[in-house]
Regions:
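N-terminal Rossmann-like dinucleotide-binding module
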Residues: 1-38, 115-118, 128, 207
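Beta-strand-loop-alpha-helix segment that lines the small-molecule cofactor/substrate pocket
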Residues: 64-65, 69-117, 131
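Core domains of carbohydrate- and sulfate-ester-processing enzymes
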Residues: 140-184
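Conserved SAM-binding strand-loop segment of SAM-dependent methyltransferases
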Residues: 41-46
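N-terminal Rossmann-like NAD(P) cofactor-binding module of classical short-chain dehydrogenase/reductase
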Residues: 58-60
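NAD(P)-dinucleotide binding in Rossmann-like oxidoreductases
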Residues: 231, 244-303
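Basic phosphate/pyrophosphate-binding loop/patch that engages nucleotide-derived ligands
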Residues: 100-107, 123-137, 147, 155-159
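Rossmann-like dinucleotide-binding domain that binds NAD(P)(H)
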Residues: 165-249, 260
């Protein structure tokens, strides 16, 4: 993918890594991706040609969500190590196929939950692990609502620079509509899944990490929400999901929109562009900890 994350990762590549190929189904984005490498990378519209190259050791998959599993499995089968953006996949079956492919072909696969790599996330984890807020019993995540398609537009011919069939890939074919891309694919269940699968993959990933719950899961899930009644986008607009965990007992809540806790340093908000629209509060039996955002930016409440 040659969108924001794709060429950002290419541009920030380590000095001991050569970006030899970039790929996107949109020729305009593809040109931008090539430019981000200083014109050194070879452009491709079809990722399968990238996987055929013997000089490619690893790939970064920053495509729409519905492509993640298929491209990860293909990369493993061709011996390429993988960094795949969150969310890792769209279904449990896809996730199992990805794990199986990585194990069978002895490939390293990393999922892009960038928030875990931030210094602030490390400090927040240590703060909780050292018992500074006591035993954590509840984590409440908040996020603004998913957009609704209140002004639908008719289907049309795809733009000349876009390979629409290849963009759809594993999805059922349908006519092109500008409400499908680029970033707005996230508001469709089959290709994005709404805010909970987009930003939730960041905020709740940190929660599972901090609570040492990566290799377990909830014993019950309760949800309520409001779904759209018009337009193409079908992800829930408002929603609240409550996950109950056992051994230890704790509750994880995802609320959109939820009760936002304003960031305490207003000057820093303006200076660094902190996005207050989504974050999490960790409630312990002695105190609480607020961790803002959860992906490229992670900030903890000063204590």
């Amino acid at each position: 993918g040659g969108g924001h994350l794709g060429y950002m990762l290419a541009r920030q590549s380590r000095g001991d890594v050569n970006v030899v190929a970039v790929c996107d189904v949109d020729e305009q984005r593809l040109a931008s991706a090539v430019k981000s490498t200083g014109g050194k990378a070879t452009p491709y519209r079809d990722y399968r040609y990238v996987l055929e190259r013997k000089d490619v050791d690893a790939v970064v998959i920053a495509t729409p969500d519905h492509w993640h599993a298929c491209q990860t499995v293909h990369a493993c089968e061709t011996g390429k190590h993988v960094y795949v953006e969150k969310p890792a996949c769209c279904t449990i079956e896809e996730g199992k196929a990805m794990v199986r492919a990585a194990r069978d072909h002895k490939i390293c696969v990393q999922v892009g939950s960038q928030g875990r790599s931030q210094r602030e996330a490390f400090l927040a984890h240590q703060y909780i692990a050292n018992g500074m807020i006591g035993k954590v019993h509840t984590v409440k995540c908040w996020h603004y609502a998913t957009p609704s398609d209140d002004n639908p537009v008719p289907d049309s011919e795809p733009p000349a620079e876009l390979d629409w069939d290849l963009w759809l890939g594993p999805l059922a074919w349908r006519p092109y509509n500008q409400r499908y891309l680029h970033g707005v694919f996230r508001w469709l269940l089959e290709s994005g899944g709404g805010q909970i699968r987009d930003r939730g993959a960041h905020v709740m990933s940190n929660a599972l990490h901090f609570m040492n719950a990566d290799h377990t899961g909830p014993v019950s899930i309760e949800t309520k929400g409001r779904v759209p009644t018009r337009g193409l986008w079908d992800s829930a607009i408002d929603m609240e999901v409550t996950y109950q965990f056992k051994n230890p007992d704790w509750t994880l809540v995802w609320a959109q929109p939820g009760e936002m806790v304003p960031y305490f340093d207003r000057d820093r908000v303006k200076r660094e562009g902190i996005r207050e629209g989504y974050s999490a509060v960790y409630y312990g039996d002695k105190d609480r900890l607020v961790v803002w955002v959860g992906d490229g930016q992670v900030y903890t409440e000063q204590k």
